[in-house]
């Protein structure tokens, strides 16, 4: 447990007296209340999370998480098992204990992923229709240069040969499976690479709660901001620009929340975020292309080539805002 103000370790958050009266503990280092959110309603806590209050994040990620995880036994070491029966029992115990321990977090991830899948599906469909109908002579389209290379000039026919075009020829259930795979892979890579860079490269760790659990919970809380674009489906706008702006705001939430929890410099957090984003961009779709092409090398090569050409064309033009 820590003080949410100075992040120093403390022995307790509050003291319970005989009449069930609770007195919050004062931090011996900064003299502030160790964790005022112990007595604050969950609605107010949620509002403070949206406002990126440092204390709200630290309360949930450090103190609340530690109290929750301490209720469950530690995992059994599989290396200590002497026979197959002991190994199987220990493995089953660890699996059951993991599902019980992280049940609430897993349900939150499932909820967020459900929204993310739907938003990704809607966004990709809107982009596909937009780019398919895009015309190089459209007055809204401004070329960055009048003498762009031929490969940079927009050709809407390219969209008909991409993986997105192939996906939208499938039935809705198969489309949903594709976008579910896309989102799960994207979130998994973001989660894995972020943990790797913070824990392994920057050697950040927390003394009491598992550092992996801390980073994982922080990502979960900040990832909730990525469902904000659902509002764009309730109050639709004419272009995709507003949705893109909201998505970038969600990215800022992730950066700020990681800064609050890890106390690393903004420069380190931004470097990690950019690196992870680039890795996701160049890994998620190629991996899915391999499966969509059914490991056919010529089809894989063609789809990746079309995606690369599409990327060049998008980089060669931009919308007049």
Curated annotation (Swiss-Prot):
Key words, A-Z: Endoplasmic reticulum, Glycoprotein, Golgi apparatus, Lipid metabolism, Lipid transport, Membrane, Sphingolipid metabolism, Transmembrane, Transmembrane helix, Transport
Transmembrane segments: 179-199, 214-234, 248-270, 272-292
Source domain of life: Eukaryota
Gene Ontology biological process terms, A to Z: endocytosis; ER to Golgi ceramide transport; GPI anchor biosynthetic process; intracellular sterol transport; regulation of plasma membrane sterol distribution; sphingolipid biosynthetic process; sphingolipid metabolic process; sterol import
UniProt keyword Methyltransferase, yes or no: no
GO CC terms, sorted: cortical endoplasmic reticulum; endoplasmic reticulum; endoplasmic reticulum membrane; Golgi apparatus; Golgi membrane
Keyword Transmembrane helix: yes
Glycosylation site positions: 296
Cell compartments where the protein resides: Endoplasmic reticulum membrane; Golgi apparatus membrane
Entries under InterPro entries matching the protein: Arv1
Membrane topology reported for the UniProt record: Multi-pass membrane protein
Family statement: Belongs to the ARV1 family.
Cited function: Mediator of sterol homeostasis involved in sterol uptake, trafficking and distribution into membranes. Also regulates the sphingolipid metabolism. Required for growth during anaerobiosis and sterol uptake.
Listed name of the protein: Protein ARV1
Organism: Saccharomyces cerevisiae (strain ATCC 204508 / S288c) (Baker's yeast)
Organismal lineage: Eukaryota, Fungi, Dikarya, Ascomycota, Saccharomycotina
Name of encoding gene: ARV1
């Amino acid at each position: 447990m820590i003080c949410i103000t100075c992040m120093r370790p403390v022995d307790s958050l509050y003291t319970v007296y005989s009449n069930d009266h609770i007195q919050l503990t004062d931090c011996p280092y900064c003299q502030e209340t160790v964790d005022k959110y112990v007595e604050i309603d969950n609605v107010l806590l949620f509002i403070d999370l949206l406002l990126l209050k440092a204390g709200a994040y630290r309360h949930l990620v450090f103190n609340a998480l530690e109290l929750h995880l301490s209720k469950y036994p530690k995992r059994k070491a599989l290396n200590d098992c002497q026979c197959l029966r002991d190994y199987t029992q220990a493995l089953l115990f660890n699996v059951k204990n993991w599902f019980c321990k992280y049940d609430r977090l897993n349900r939150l991830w499932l909820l967020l992923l459900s929204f993310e899948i739907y938003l990704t599906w809607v966004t990709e469909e809107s982009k596909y229709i937009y780019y398919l109908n895009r015309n190089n002579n459209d007055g809204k389209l401004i070329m960055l240069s009048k003498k762009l290379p031929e490969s940079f000039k927009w050709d809407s026919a390219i969209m008909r040969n991409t993986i997105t075009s192939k996906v939208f020829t499938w039935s809705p259930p198969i489309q949903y499976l594709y976008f579910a795979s896309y989102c799960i892979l994207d979130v998994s890579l973001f989660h894995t690479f972020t943990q790797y860079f913070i824990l392994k490269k920057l050697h950040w760790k927390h003394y009491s709660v598992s550092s992996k659990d801390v980073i994982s919970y922080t990502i979960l809380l900040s990832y909730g901001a990525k469902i904000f674009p659902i509002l764009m489906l309730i109050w639709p706008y004419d272009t995709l620009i507003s949705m893109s702006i909201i998505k970038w705001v969600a990215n800022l939430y992730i950066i700020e929340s990681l800064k609050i929890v890890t106390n690393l410099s903004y420069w380190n957090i931004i470097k990690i975020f950019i690196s992870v984003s680039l890795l996701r961009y160049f890994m998620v779709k190629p991996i899915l292309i391999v499966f969509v092409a059914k490991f056919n090398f010529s089809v894989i090569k063609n789809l990746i080539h079309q995606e690369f050409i599409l990327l060049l064309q998008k980089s060669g033009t931009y919308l007049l805002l």
